[in-house]
Each structure stands twice: as C-alpha cells, then as structure tokens.
Curated annotation (Swiss-Prot):
It is a peripheral membrane protein. Catalyzes the conversion of dihydroorotate to orotate with quinone as electron acceptor. Its cofactor is FMN. Transmembrane segments: none annotated. This is Dihydroorotate dehydrogenase (quinone). Binds 1 FMN per subunit. Keywords: Cell membrane, Flavoprotein, FMN, Membrane, Oxidoreductase, Pyrimidine biosynthesis.
Amino acid sequence: MYQLFRHGIFQMDAEKAHDFTIQCLKLASNPLFQPILKSLIHAPKGFPKTVMGVNFPNPIGLAAGADKNGDAIDGFGTLGFGFLEVGTVTPVAQDGNAKPRQFRLIEAEGIINRNGFNNNGIDYLIENVKNARYKGVIGINIGKNKFTSLEQGKDDYIFCLNKAYNYAGYITVNISSPNTPDLRQLQYGDYFDDLLRSIKDRQAILANQYNKYVPIAVKIAPDLTESELVQIADTLVRHKMDGVIATNTTVSRDTVMGMKNAEQQGGLSGKPLQHKSTEIIKRLHQELKGQIPIIGSGGIDGLQNAQEKIEAGAELLQVYSGLIYHGPKLVKELVKNIK
C-alpha cells in the first residue's frame, strides 16, 4: 500500500510531497481517524528503554526535520515510534531559504535539503505539543534564527530552552545544520564551551523552577576531523551534557558523485550517510566511554544497519529519510526487533 502512496508523492516536488504527507498525518491525528490508522498499521509495542533518565516505550524515534512545527505528532505517533523529535524550531518564525530546497537522489535513496530552519516559531510548536495526545516521549529540537549573530546565538537557544523546558521529554540543541550560515562554528572552541556552559546553567535554574530535570542533548555533524571529534567529546563530558545525537546531514558528496541532484547545495541524508554516521557513533562511543548516551541517526533503512548503529554504541535510534523511501513498515520492523 505504501508503494502506491510513494509512487504518487514521488511525482511531486520533494517539499510539496513532504507538506502533503504532513497534512495527511495531521488528518490522521483526528480522534475519528486514529482507530482506522491504528488498525491498518498494527504497530508493535517494542522494548522499553531508559536513556538520559527518561523512560522510552521503545528505542525507535522520528528524527527532527520531519515534523518541524509539531503539526502531526499524533499521526506520526500512530506509526509506533517510542519517541518523536519535533523541530528544529527557532525563537521567531522564519521562511528559511529560497525554494526549491529539497531534492531526492532516488537511485541512492538519499535526500538533499537546504531548508534553513523554516518554521513557525517556538510558541506555535509548544501549543501543538501541549495539545498532543501521543503517549511516547516528545523531544524538542531548538536552533537559532538566521538573522541572529553567532555571538548572540546562545541567547536564541536560551530563549527556546525557557519556552520548551516544561513541555519536553528532552531537548536537543541543534548546532550542526549546514543550512544556517556559520551555525556549525558553534560546535568548536570557545563558542561551544560558552554555549554549553550557558545552557547547563539555565537547565539548573529551570529544573529548580519546575521541580523536574529535563535532559539536554547536542546534535553534531558527521563532517568532523579526528581532532574535532575528540574535542567535541571532551567538551560534552566536561559540561555533563545528557546526550548526543550523531549525526546531522553531511555536506560531503563522496557517495553520490555524478548522480542526479548530487550537485545541489545543502545537507545530504539517507542511505549515502549510513556508513559515515555509524563511524562517527563508533568513534564517539570510544571517546565518551559510556559517560554520555548516544542517539544514532543517519541513513537507517533496515534492521541490519540499525543493529550496526546499536553495536557501534547508540542506545536510541532515529529515522526520517528511510521512512520516506520505505514507509511505515520500516518503523514496525525496527520497533519489533531493536532492544
């Protein structure tokens, strides 16, 4: 059945297809349609897992970027995910980069996007999170507005942290999108140190204010040198971050040279990222020595490579591009088998 749906949406522009899918899932979020979708999907329960002090119904999650504004939380939830990461969201709504900005690499099962954090702003997202009936864990992925300077960047993250804290199962600090100018600079040196220090200080204040501890993860890029990765791991440990998501999209085109759309600028996700993200997880796991849990993301399209990420050191997994190419059966297969 999904093959038929996929055939239809693949005739559309990639972003229009995405928006259409979100509208379908939003419709499926309606209590009238939920039982129908549930009976069609037959989502398995999976294996509960506690990571970052949070109880996840199962270790399979939806990666950020799929539901930027939290418009289809209950629809995605019906597919069987143990957790959903919504966002990336910024303090103020922004349009993102010029269209077209999403491109399929069908033969490689990849996607290139240069969206640029297009979203309706944190307040809009929080309303959707508050209204969701989904019983799994909701992570909120936060970023900075394009017009905010690097020097003022941490203020945007603190602003979003304040708004999201009371409504999130966990919060992700996204400093690794390649589509916001200079954003990845926040992963390095004094910027990184300063950002994490500010975030941890604010987390302590909010934990006291709301009388609950909400863990904070950092999402990193796959395009790191050995020394950069070591430095990032050291900084994460030093600031006692609660988790790390490895990885975001890649700017490399090594695996897709010569393919249609490969020349498009932006971050490449899907199968071409599979090996690279697993290698980063492996190296990160060696550096972190179990002190900080890893959430694995990047090119998961089946049980075998999902298992490879677990063996490399990931405790939770996230999918997005694989869902586009393989449909709900991918989620079902992973939830049924991954512990």
